[in-house]
Amino acid sequence: MDAVNENGKRAMKDDSHGNSTSPKRRKSRHISALILARGGSKGIPLKNIKMLAGVPLIGWVIRAAVDSNVFNSVWVSTDHEEIAKVALAWGAKVHKRSPEVSQDSSSSLDTIREFSRQHREVDVICNIQATSPCLHPKHLTEAVELITKQGYDSVFSVVRRHNFRWKEVEKGGDCSTEPMNLNPACRPRRQDWSGELCENGSFYFAKKELIEQGLLQGGKKTYYEMKPEYSVDIDVDIDWPVAEQRVLRFGYFGKDKPEVVRLLLCNVSGCLTDGQIYTSASGEEMVSINIRDQIGISMLKKEGVKVILLETYPIAKALAVRLSERMGCPLLHHMDDKLKEVERIMVEEKLEWKEVAYLGNDEADVKCLELAGLSGVPVDAPTVALNHTKYTCHNAAGHGAVREFAEHILLLKKKAKSQMEQDRICRDAF
């Protein structure tokens, strides 16, 4: 039977090696996701943990892998401590690769084989590219079934391209180029040509036996076709802004639906302000706020999102009261147990955690950051907060972080609403 791809078409199989393994051979397989994230990226330094749309790059694929629920284990192979910390924070295990497979000349297969040899319990490895932030759980779920249910030995992701290719000739030479996949006398229209399948590099599933032979694609092999909008790869800095826009539209943001956010809880010190209290010559205490942050709060309120300000530092209480009056938002202060107080508010408002957005900045916020449907911290927040948030702002506290997070909430709400409208369309009517 031919494999089914994302577009509902049949994927072609290749039995050329005759190494097909029956899915009945073993009732249970250990399937691992393996994300390669070397610290010495030449194109973009520490690219794998650079923030993309508020999430470390590897965070996008780790989240997709974990939420797919098809893997017995999800690993990040790295030689860098900071990458390891981020991987653990996002729910992956860490494989500390050896110096021998951490060189510029080391291939992905070298690293995968090292992992395979050190983890004998693993039967199938899915090498997921860290630079594919638009990967969704459903892509992995559907692809793994080609191995577990249809008996394929290796599966890799592809995208359909409609590019006309020409033979390369030496510069300065007098040789004529020739077409490689078209007849210029009968140039096809796009709609009349099915295009060509090209690897998009998102993932490669392979059984352990193939990997030990030095192959990621072999035996009874097939492809999984992904739509172009999900086929994003990042190699150089110039790709970053383009990828960010693509991710905001087509990326996977987790199981919780952002359109249900009804309440934003926002710290005053360390989020709305930069955490500093200024003293005038006359002894008056002052703080500064960014007008963009005030506008951001107004934008949320206009869209029906309630905003409550939080302040835990007694010295800043009077200033926080003045800010809450200026913002037109309720203020909660003197909280010995922030989590308990937030849950009390949720009961009063009849809300669940998935309906709450939380902007925090310190250790006292960690539990709320973890539980909130959408959470964020300013870029200058302490590491303990950065490691437990779903979104990290590009802007610092008191310098536009609140406005940025507000825009992120509204963008996800718009994205989800658009998807809901698309889901209501009756495709049979076309």
UniProtKB/Swiss-Prot annotation:
GO terms for molecular function: N-acylneuraminate cytidylyltransferase activity. It catalyses: an N-acylneuraminate + CTP = a CMP-N-acyl-beta-neuraminate + diphosphate. Residues 7-17 have a biased composition (Basic and acidic residues). The keyword Transferase applies. It is found in: Nucleus. Its EC number is 2.7.7.43. Pfam families: CTP_transf_3. The keyword Nucleus applies. Keywords: Nucleotidyltransferase, Nucleus, Transferase. Belongs to the CMP-NeuNAc synthase family. This is N-acylneuraminate cytidylyltransferase A. It comes from Danio rerio (Zebrafish). The lineage of its organism: Eukaryota, Metazoa, Chordata, Craniata, Vertebrata.
